[in-house]
Amino acid sequence: DLLKAFRRTIKDAPLPAPLSAKLDAMHQSFPSGTTPRCRSSANNEDLVGFTGAGLYDSYTHRADEGHIGTSIKQVWASLWDLRALNERDFYRIDHMTAAMGVLVHPNFDDELVNGVALTRNIYYPDFEGYFINAQIGENLVTNPDGAEIAEEVLVLQTINENSPYPYETIYVRRSSLVPDGGTVLSHIDLMTLVSLLQRIQGHFQQRYDRADDPSFAMDVEFKVDSNRQLTIKQARPWLR
């Protein structure tokens, strides 16, 4: 199997000394006891007409696995999994333009919630809002197993002048993993997330010189851990 052999070559290849030193310094910069997660982030994900969701592999780097480059090379090698190759072929994506980046962040064990959010009102684009998908624990949002359904929430800027809250929420769909009438995200978590989404949107609008572009939006991934700490894991421009 040529692909399997190629992946093995990538995993076994020694890292250049300067890169190895920088990766080790990055690893050591995490607080003591932190288990890092090496997350795939390819340049051919979330393209127009091609999401690439779930094609590539991410790895948790455990304390007994030595240099973090071991796990990073595993992520790089996943660019050449058979399924990924076939998907790129089908969508006519040039393999020679494909590249794999790795996002390293603390691993989240015992997650209470995971989710993705868009800094855009996808139902009424001319009206400010945020579209949020969330699910209990580590259950997948983008590629759910079986018949699981994620929570879908639209958060809108309120037009009720007498409302004590700046936003109102519309539950488009309820999670199949919570009791009837329950929610995945608490109201406090939801409002905290919206505040962070506002900051992310404003930052990247300036960063990409898109402050005057009403179509610009960010695709954001978040987690709520066992201590109820909400953390942003990843943010990138949304491609329609």
Can you annotate each of these PLM segments?
Residues 84, 209, 239-240:
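Short linear functional motifs in flexible/disordered or boundary regions
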Residues 1-103, 202-205, 217-219, 226:
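N-terminal beta-alpha lobe that positions the nucleotide/phosphoryl donor
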